[in-house]
């Protein structure tokens, strides 16, 4: 088995990395180090990606792996590690990859289209105000049904991302292997702005209202920020690719939710 090892160089202790390399060597896995910012060539030639780090690193790697139709196993070296399949002290369980004793969850992703550019998200796409701006005015269309929001922002989340920023803003925790899109307002200035869950085939179009004052941005999985204007609509749909998340342990959704988010 060929393995792409993916980690943030500044985020993982040397002794953990060395233990991983020793474990892979003992299992006769051929492994390659993937560049954090340019991993595509390495991922393409491997069978599976091992992402060593916290949730941000794991989700960043999951997105890259999904675009190459590759599986990913997250190994938690961070604080929460909600989407990790193993903890850093469980590297001895990697032998289960060799004998095929694991399952793969297929996680829905989002495709974001702005003009002629496409972007992909594993967790969420967030339309939000700038740091010093007042609340923004957002027009959103859900398969033809129109909604208007006055808020600090809107979170469009996959089920995988529902337990991240969306949950903190009052959105629902959704079983991560479902296909749907959750929509959670951030500090809405309205008595009727409930979180929504819509069908995965719903085409969502978002525009910043011309009456909106101040800057507005779109952030993708918390790592890419795009400044928005009032002229260019944002189209949000279910992506045509899935993140392939490897699970070695038999922990279910509710057990992980209870243990990780206290």
Where are these regions (language model features)?
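ATP/NTP phosphate-donor binding region
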Residues: 1-48, 52, 60, 64-67, ...
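A residue-level signal for conserved active-site and pocket-lining positions in enzyme catalytic cores
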Residues: 8, 50, 76, 125, ...
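Short glycine-rich anion-binding loops that position phosphate/pyrophosphate groups of nucleotides
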Residues: 54-57, 78-80, 160-163
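Proline-centered loop/turn at the N-terminus of a beta-strand
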Residues: 69-71
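Catalytic core of DAGKc-family lipid kinases
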Residues: 80-152
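A generic structural signal for short beta-strands and their flanking turns/coil linkers
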Residues: 106-110, 121-123, 134-138, 152-154, ...
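ATP/nucleoside-binding phosphotransfer catalytic cores, i.e., glycine-rich phosphate-binding loops
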Residues: 119, 127, 132, 143-146, ...
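Gly/Ser/Thr-rich active-site loops/lids in small-molecule metabolic enzymes
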Residues: 148-152, 156-192
């Amino acid at each position: 088995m060929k393995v792409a090892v993916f980690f943030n160089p500044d985020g993982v202790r040397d002794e953990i990395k060395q233990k991983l390399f020793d474990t892979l060597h003992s299992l006769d896995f051929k492994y390659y180090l993937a560049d954090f910012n340019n991993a595509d060539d390495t991922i393409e030639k491997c069978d599976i990606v091992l992402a060593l780090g916290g949730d941000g690193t794991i989700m960043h790697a999951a997105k890259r792996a999904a675009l190459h139709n590759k599986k990913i196993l997250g190994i938690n070296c961070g604080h929460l590690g909600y989407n990790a399949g193993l903890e850093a002290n469980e590297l001895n369980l990697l032998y289960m990859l060799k004998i095929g004793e694991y399952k793969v969850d297929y996680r829905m992703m989002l495709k974001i289209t702005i003009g002629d550019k496409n972007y992909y998200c594993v967790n969420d796409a967030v339309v939000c105000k700038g740091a010093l701006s007042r609340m923004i005015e957002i027009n959103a269309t859900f398969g033809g049904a129109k909604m208007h929001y006055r808020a600090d922002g809107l979170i469009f989340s996959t089920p995988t991302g529902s337990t991240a920023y969306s949950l903190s803003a009052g959105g629902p925790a959704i079983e991560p292997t479902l296909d749907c899109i959750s929509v959670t307002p951030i500090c809405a200035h309205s008595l009727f702005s409930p979180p929504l869950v819509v069908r995965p085939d719903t085409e969502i179009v978002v525009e910043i209202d011309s009456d909106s004052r101040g800057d507005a941005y779109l952030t993708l999985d918390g790592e890419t920020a795009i400044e928005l204007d009032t002229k260019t609509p944002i189209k949000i749909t279910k992506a045509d690719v899935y993140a392939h998340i490897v699970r070695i342990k038999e922990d279910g959704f509710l057990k992980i939710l209870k243990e990780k988010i206290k």
